[in-house]
Amino acid sequence: MLVLALAAGLWACSSAPPRAPNPTRPLDERRAVEIIIQAFHDQRDRPVPGQAVQLAPSRKLEVDVVAQGRKYGVAYVTARERSELGDALPPRDPAMGDALQLVSGLGADGDARVLVVHDTDYLYDDHVGEEHEDTTVTAELKLRRDVRDFLVRAHAERWP
């Protein structure tokens, strides 16, 4: 009888099983580019559409936004682009945590500095209310902060 009472007490005190995290997805590339452009305006840079930068003899990185008259910009890299670039895009160093990833081009693009932002770093879920874990606003603010930090460095170091 005592065993049944203890078992009933333990069952009543047990918590619900842990639930799986909400499925997430990255910011849409068009929205990400809008945020990048706004960050350029915030830092008093003139954003213009970017162009491809040679990373390897047969592979180019599409830069989404560059500063007018300068050789620095931002590339929002999607899964498709990562797949196409393969090993031409240097791997991120896990020891660096969430440090910004900068790449330079080859040849004529050798002095170009590009901030590579991976879509997988800007995830959100579609849930609302208390079920919401990763908001769109949080992902957008993180992207804006990362671009702003890059631009502050570009200005401080007087990049071409």
Regions found by a protein language model. Name each.
Residues V63-Y76:
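Active-site beta-strand-loop-beta-strand hairpin of nuclease catalytic cores
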